Amino acid sequence: MDPALARSALESGLNAVIAAEPEVTRYDTVVGDGDCSIGLKRGAEAVQQLLQSSKLSSVDDAALFLDQIIGVVETSMDGTSGALYAIYLNALASGLRSQSGQSEARAKVWAAAAKSAMQSMAKYTPAKPGDRTLVDALAPFVDTLTQTGDVHKAAKAADDGANSTKGMKASLGRTVYIGGQGFQEVPDPGAYGLAQFFTGLAQKL
């Protein structure tokens, strides 16, 4: 992995998450307790600070790159979504390490690791597409990346997946307990925020 390209793409994704904070807050105020955007923004800003500290300037190993990001995510994001991100990223790093000797196209290596990470995350959460969670954006991204090797198509699939949660009744998460009809009006905040990250990421790849 080209460190400069990786940082540029990650920075773009993080900027997209931060820019989406008002919209995520609006959605979460309708169907949640309004703290989803706080966690996402806090995590994004913490990773930005790491990138700007130049500690990653000499990193040319993708798994090691992720390890440093994971450390920040684990300390800056709380709640269920923070735990899921940490679990997924740890599994993603492990998946990349298992393929370190392969000569496949870079996107295919990342896709295989991403798919493996999805399987690992499933051991810790019952969330699946259709449950109105961040998985509604993550799963189509991983599936499309696996099928096509195209990050832009994968990001579009994530965006479509997030938008599909509008009107979807929640099976998991706080929305289940809050109830009401707000879910008919807005997409899942976590899925929307993650889709924005993927869209920003793809713009630099």
Predicted stretch roles:
Residues 1-205:
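N-terminal loops that bind phosphate or other acidic moieties
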